[in-house]
Design a protein with these regions (language model features):
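GG-anchored amphipathic helix commonly corresponding to the ABC/SMC/Rad50 NBD signature/C-loop
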Residues: 72, 76-79, 92-114
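Conserved D-loop-proximal element of ABC-family nucleotide-binding domains
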Residues: 108-109, 121-129
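C-terminal lobe/lid and adjacent interdomain/linker elements of RecA-like ASCE P-loop ATPase modules
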Residues: 126-200
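Short pre-catalytic strand/loop immediately N-terminal to key active-site residues, enriched for Gly-Thr
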Residues: 82-89
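Long, charged, glycine-rich C-terminal linkers/tails
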Residues: 44-68
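Extended, charged alpha-helical coiled-coil/arm scaffolds that mediate oligomerization and mechanical coupling
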Residues: 1-46, 50
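Walker B catalytic acidic pair
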Residues: 117-118
Length: 200
């Protein structure tokens, strides 16, 4: 009878789903531990000493994406327990954690262009240089666009644009200008000193 055949097909499909979903769950658990450890290690050099990154896998009935929900958790300091990333990380921390994840997963990621806005908020000196080097490393395999105010980050770029704002007719107008090699050097030097660059 067709009703019995249909029930049997449904049972077979359910068994196949559970088998594949179980394999996916095992792979996710292993990948979550590895990625969590690597991102936590990267956070130490990105001005988040003592910070931890974890991936929580919470089981539920299942859907087309598997048998668990996935949530990124972070703690900015060793004394804090990890909380949902979106609720506890500042904009700059989010950007740096995203940068760490992108660098770590770059070999398997298919994203052709990455955009980082204010990845350097709240950092300077050596940490800024590390961020710049990580961005440059990412840029060897894909296009990376980064808005930055730090010369240590800007100096790592292959191409530079300068964004400026001016008052016009009672409003503010933003403009963007491509910087040629000499202008790039001058702009990075200006960022270092904060003043107009002169010949002396």
């Amino acid at each position: 009878d067709s009703g019995g055949d249909e029930a049997q097909r449904e049972q077979m499909a359910q068994a196949q789903y559970l088998d594949l979903a179980g394999k996916l769950s095992a792979a996710r658990k292993e990948a979550a531990q590895k990625l969590g450890g690597k991102v936590s290690a990267a956070m130490q050099s990105l001005a988040m000493a003592g910070g931890r990154f974890e991936i929580a896998l919470t089981g539920f009935e299942g859907n087309a994406h598997g048998l668990e929900e996935i949530e990124f958790l972070v703690s900015a300091h060793a004394s804090l327990s990890p909380k949902p990333l979106a609720k506890v990380a500042s904009g700059g921390e989010l950007s740096r954690i995203s940068l760490a994840i992108q660098v770590i997963t770059s070999k398997v990621s298919l994203v052709p262009t990455l955009i980082f806005d204010e990845v350097d908020v709240g950092i300077g000196g050596g940490v800024a240089e590390i961020v710049g080097q990580l961005l440059k490393q990412l840029g060897t395999e894909r296009q990376v666009l980064c808005v930055t105010h730090l010369p240590q980050v800007a100096a790592q770029g292959n191409h530079h644009w300068q964004v400026s704002k001016s008052s016009q007719g009672g409003g503010v107008v933003s403009s963007i200008q491509v910087l040629e090699p000499a202008a790039r050097i001058e702009e990075v030097a200006r960022m270092l000193g904060g003043v107009e660059v002169t010949a002396t």
